[in-house]
């Protein structure tokens, strides 16, 4: 399998941590993708240009960190990425949603501060801090 990432993507970091926890580093090649550049060769691999993106052993491409985490856990027989049943399920899902929202804001903030200073939106930066 091959996982395409960018260095600063919190979503890619999440999957890299899971790969470590599952002890499958030797089964997943991690490749830095060049995103947000015109004519990047990465667009031939994933037309949306988003990361993380996993190419499975059968050639299927998976986009979305939750989907990739669920897939890896299913393939390697782990319950690390499953919600508990019963009364705890909705609280776990609620906390998962809060964490996803935090990661969304972090992604926007990181992308904004990476821009040249004359192109940054101070409003966006202030909102996401």
Locate the predicted segments by residue.
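Amphipathic alpha-helical packing segments from all-alpha helical-bundle domains
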Residues: 123-129
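GST-like domain detector, emphasizing the conserved glutathione-binding G-site
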Residues: 1-121
């Amino acid at each position: 399998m091959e996982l395409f990432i960018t260095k600063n993507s919190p979503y890619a970091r999440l999957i890299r941590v899971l790969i470590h926890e599952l002890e499958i580093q030797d089964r997943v090649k991690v490749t830095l993708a060049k995103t947000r550049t015109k004519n990047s060769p990465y667009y031939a691999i994933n037309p949306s240009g988003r990361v993380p993106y996993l190419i499975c052993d059968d050639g299927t491409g998976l986009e979305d960190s939750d989907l990739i985490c669920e897939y890896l856990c299913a393939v390697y027989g782990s319950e690390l990425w499953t919600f508990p049943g019963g009364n705890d399920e909705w609280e776990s899902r609620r906390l998962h949603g809060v964490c996803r929202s935090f990661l969304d804001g972090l992604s926007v903030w990181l992308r904004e501060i990476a821009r040249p200073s004359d192109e940054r939106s101070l409003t966006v930066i202030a909102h996401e801090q």
